[in-house]
Amino acid sequence: MAESIRRKLALVLVASLLALAAPFSVADTKETIEAGASQALGRLRAHSAAAGELVDQAHAVLVFPDVVKMGFGVGGEYGEGALQIGGVTQAYYVIAGVSFGLEAGAEYKSEVILFMTEEALRDFRNSSGWQVGVDGAVVLAKEGAEGAIDTLNSREPVLGFIFSNRGLIFNLSLDGAKITRIAR
C-alpha cells in the first residue's frame, strides 16, 4: 500500500513539473528533429564504428537526439525523435518515462533504437503506444573487451544505444519508457 501511495505521489510530482515547464517549452519542428537525428547518428558513429555498422544493418532506426531527464528523488524523461528507414524519416515519436531513485538535477542524452528484423519493426509500427519491456524488449549495447561494443547481442530483434557527448553510456536502461507516435 505504501508503494502505491509513493507511486501516485511521484506521478503527481512529475505531472506538476511537466505542467510548470509546459508554457516554456515548444514542440520541435520536423526540421529540428531531423537535424538532431542526423547529428546524433553522426555522434554515435564517431563513438563506435561497431555501432555504425549495426545502424547500417538495421531495418529501421528510431533516433531521439535530445532526451532530457530531470527530477529530485522522482524523475521523468522526455524526448522527441524520428523513425528512419533507409535514411528517410517515416514518422515522428516521443519517448517518456518516470523513474525512482537518487536523482537530482537534469541531464541530456541521446537514445537510438535499432529494429534489426522486419517483424520487430512491424510490431512497433502497429502499436498505438509501445512500452519498452512490456510490448517489446530493447537490448542495450554492452561494453565488451577493451571498451569495444559487444556485438554478440547484434542478433537480437531490437537493439539500443544511450550516449552523451562524452560517449556511450552502458549502465542505464530504457525499461518502462513509453514511445508514442506524434503528428508533425
Identify the role of each PLM range.
Residues 2-13:
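Bacterial N-terminal signal peptides that target proteins for export
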Residues 27-184:
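Small-residue-enriched, tightly packed secondary-structure blocks
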